[in-house]
Amino acid sequence: NEYLKNEHSVTTVIADHWKSLEKIDQSLLHNKKTLCLIHSKEINHPVGSGLNERVLNTLSKTNFIISNSNFTKKLAISLNISPEKIKVINPGVEKYEKPSDENIKISKELFKNSFPKLITVSRFDKRKNHDKVIMTIRNLREIYPNIKYLCIGYGDEENNLKKLVKELKLENIIIFKKNINSNLKSAFLNQSDIFIMPSIIYKKSVEGFGISFMEAAQQGTASIGGID
């Protein structure tokens, strides 16, 4: 507030989260274009709840509300956010990065002669549905004995997923990796047959837009997603 009060050259305010805008005095925004980005999980609070009212009051200060997908826009409208203000701008991805020969070699060594080669790149969250994929692979192993599944990421569910893999005796089929560079990630995507991330709605958490699907497409890899 103090900065906006004293800095008269500011013409536009862009908030990356509704909470970033919540405490700004509306009187300081009257001669400025104000935009706020929204994501599904951040606004998904029951209509009439205290958090929903805070979201609505805060977003009433804006000229434009930037949604990352049509899914998020529909969710926002269902939560009584003004549809007239919402503009959909899909997130972008980094410019295409050709995997290095060295990283392609690393990827081929990991997958060896496996088929099909499955991959997921995401946080290990409940809504990403890794556990269902793992249990499905247990059954697919009977049909595809050389199947391989690479999970790249980290998150709260990591230990639970590794425990599940051990219980199902899939340690030689399912591989976990994290903290890899973007070029190696591109190589793994490039060498995979299918990118799989059948996301679900879990409590307030929803998949508003999956950038990983676009990254897989950049490498010519088909995807399987969820309807939620």
Task: Label every model-predicted segment.
Residues 71, 92:
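Carbohydrate-associated surface elements
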Residues 66, 110-128, 134-137, 150:
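Conserved donor-binding/catalytic core segment of Leloir-type glycosyltransferases
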